[in-house]
Swiss-Prot record:
This is 1-deoxy-D-xylulose 5-phosphate reductoisomerase. Belongs to the DXR family. Its cofactor is Mg(2+); Mn(2+). NADPH binds at T7, G8, S9, I10, G31, K32, N33, N113, E115, G187. PANTHER family: 1-DEOXY-D-XYLULOSE 5-PHOSPHATE REDUCTOISOMERASE, 1-DEOXY-D-XYLULOSE 5-PHOSPHATE REDUCTOISOMERASE, CHLOROPLASTIC.
Length: 368
């Protein structure tokens, strides 16, 4: 298989599962962590390797692997790969072209890059995509029951770093505080997306494209991250998917469902410890951006705007140019502005053009 973004949290776990299942690695790609990909090359001996920055070529130790550079290089690498499975764990809209290329080459796409579905779900062949996250894996597992008719799909949120921060102090928080996730150890971007609830807006849109635009879709807070998803059926019964908070479960099913079902990749749940499970609504007072959930479900192509403005705001926030209130404000302004506009987005080029327009418009926003 091919692992794009092999040095990130998902990529590292995917390689662990590949080793366990005896799956050979044809190709790897990474962003800036050349030291780690050099170690991965030694262990997995891929035939092809892609890195983002040509300035890192001198430090790369490909050990005979063919080397590709940049986002176009990743596309070229996918073009040449014979593997049937591509795991796309690239962070951000940078992973969008790789998703398109993988599907064009008739590969099965294990998708951890949320931005692909958020920005271009209407253009992707969903039948070839397996989502790599705990919420959508939970929904998939629950929807295997073909007797009951689903009515609404519900995913859970931990609440992120600011779930207990006094409301009047949220706007002044910095990135260092936003990166203190209560339950998970993840990359910087997804951890901050969790604090802002952008991650859950992304996952709501992913649910829309993956499992049914006709169903009611919602989210709630479950602080322990043990309940990942719930499905309410037409008979008003509800079934929940519970599992330890460990990404190796959805990753293992994305790689090989049969092997994944025959052996455990996560620790068993201690059912006696579950007395603490409690569901809470997502408050728009605390999570201001959550008020756009219905707007996004009514016009899911606004996902391009959500993602582009989020990446612009994220960069400013991580660079300490703005506080958390400014971060939220940039995204709010972008969604309010583009909600009034009409766009078709009938091709990848049109998606990328709108993405660029939003970045240019909001990238120049002064300090907030």
């Amino acid at each position: 298989m091919v692992v794009l973004g092999s040095t990130g949290s998902i990529g590292k776990n995917a390689l662990k599962i590949a080793k366990k299942f005896g799956v050979k690695i044809e190709a790897l790609s990474c962003g800036k962590n050349i030291a780690l990909i050099n170690e991965q090359i030694k262990v997995f001996k891929p035939k092809k390797v892609a890195i983002l920055d040509p300035n890192d070529l001198n430090n790369l130790e490909p050990l005979g692997a063919e080397v590709f550079v940049g986002l176009d290089g990743i596309d070229a690498m996918i073009e040449e790969c014979v593997s049937n499975l591509v795991i796309n764990a690239i962070v951000g809209v940078a992973g969008l072209k790789a998703s398109f290329k993988s599907l064009q080459r008739n590969k099965k796409l294990a998708l951890a890059n949320k931005e692909s579905l958020v920005s271009a779900g209407h253009l992707l062949d969903i039948s070839q995509i397996t989502p790599v996250d705990s919420e959508h894996f939970g929904l998939w597992a629950l929807l295997q029951n073909k007797t009951l008719k689903p009515k609404s799909l519900i995913i859970s949120a931990s609440g992120g770093a600011f779930r207990d921060t006094p409301l009047d102090l949220i706007a002044i928080q910095n990135a260092q505080n936003a990166l203190k996730h209560p339950n998970w150890s993840m990359g910087d971007k997804i951890t901050i997306d969790s604090a802002s609830m952008v991650n859950k807006l992304f996952e709501i849109l992913e649910t829309y494209w993956l499992f049914g635009a006709s169903l009611k879709i919602d989210a709630l807070i479950e602080r322990s991250s043990i309940v990942h998803a719930l499905v309410e059926f037409e008979d008003n019964s509800v079934i929940a998917h519970l599992a330890s908070a460990d990404m190796q479960l959805p990753i293992s099913y994305a790689i090989n469902p049969k092997l994944a079902s025959l052996s455990a990749s996560i620790k068993p749940l201690d059912l006696y410890a579950l007395s603490a499970i409690k569901f809470e609504p997502i408050s728009v007072e605390r999570y201001t951006l959550w008020r756009y959930k219905d707007l996004l479900l009514e016009n899911p192509k606004l996902g391009v705007v959500l993602n582009a403005s989020n990446e612009v705001a994220m960069k400013k926030f991580l660079n300490q140019e703005i506080a958390f209130g400014g971060f939220i404000q940039i995204i709010s302004q972008a969604l309010e502005l583009y909600a009034k506009k009409s766009f078709k987005l009938s091709s990848l080029d049109e998606v990328l053009a709108l993405d660029k327009e939003v970045r240019e418009r909001f990238g120049s926003v002064a300090r907030v």
